[in-house]
Amino acid sequence: MKIAVYGKGGIGKSTTSCNISIALARRGKKVLQIGCDPKHDSTFTLTGFLIPTIIDTLQSKDYHYEDVWPEDVIYKGYGGVDCVEAGGPPAGAGCGGYVVGETVKLLKELNAFYEYDVILFDVLGDVVCGGFAAPLNYADYCIIITDNGFDALFAANRIAASVREKARTHPLRLAGLVGNRTSKRDLIDKYVEACPMPVLEVLPLIEDIRISRVKGKTLFEMAESEPSLDYVCEFYLNIADQLLARPEGVVPKEVPDRELFSLLSDFYLNPANNASSIEQPTDSIVQSEQEPFLII
């Protein structure tokens, strides 16, 4: 299974990706996480340091693939999760999609690409140009990380459009949304009404999620010394269980930009009209089962 994780810049994709990777490993799967961001910090909370990138390694070998060994580019992270950072071209030059392609090419050369039960691509920001949409070419599922805010959901809608476009020629489905660190989900629910898709999980506004990034640890590692965080890990285990069940997923039909702008801005400009939509805090919400949607 191959999963591509997208979302607005700064929304918590890497933190969420690392914890999902650990959750999948806890379920007995062999997991590889590939960071697809020039900052090469996707796997930081798994390894505790910034690992060398594929591009750096290839450059040091003068792009002689035969001189590269698995241990040159694949690093063991917490919980047995293997980690790779694709890296990227110099700022303002080159194409990130090319880098992702070179990464996959090298892993295939090393006979590593097909050795894993799950490969998770953690992709930068909400950039959905052809280059950084490249991981969707390899993915079975896409997950979109969001919060209950206007900007994150607007970005999610653009990513949904990319999934729909890629699904024309690839066996790709949107597994669903993950709400990250949000005390409410009214805007998320309003968006999902307009663009039907599953909501895999909504994580409450937990400060330790943010702190974990600063500490360079996953929530699972922090929970070893702070058992009070075990309940946070359950959110990620729930996401992992849903993914391992091989959901049908959806081919989303994005909301037109102007329509979405009106839909979401109405919640801010006319709060009284939406009083009935205001929900309980997410830590008191029990997610109900959803029938999968398939929209063509």
UniProtKB/Swiss-Prot annotation:
Coiled coil: none
Cellular component terms (Gene Ontology): chloroplast
Entry keyword set: 4Fe-4S, ATP-binding, Chlorophyll biosynthesis, Chloroplast, Iron, Iron-sulfur, Magnesium, Metal-binding, Nucleotide-binding, Oxidoreductase, Photosynthesis, Plastid
Cofactor(s) needed for function: [4Fe-4S] cluster
Residues reported to bind ATP: G10, I11, G12, K13, S14, T15, K39, N180, R181
Entry's cofactor comment: Binds 1 [4Fe-4S] cluster per dimer.
The protein's assembly and partners: Homodimer. Protochlorophyllide reductase is composed of three subunits; ChlL, ChlN and ChlB.
Family to which the UniProt record says this protein belongs: Belongs to the NifH/BchL/ChlL family.
Name the UniProt record assigns to this protein: Light-independent protochlorophyllide reductase iron-sulfur ATP-binding protein
Organism field: Chlorokybus atmophyticus
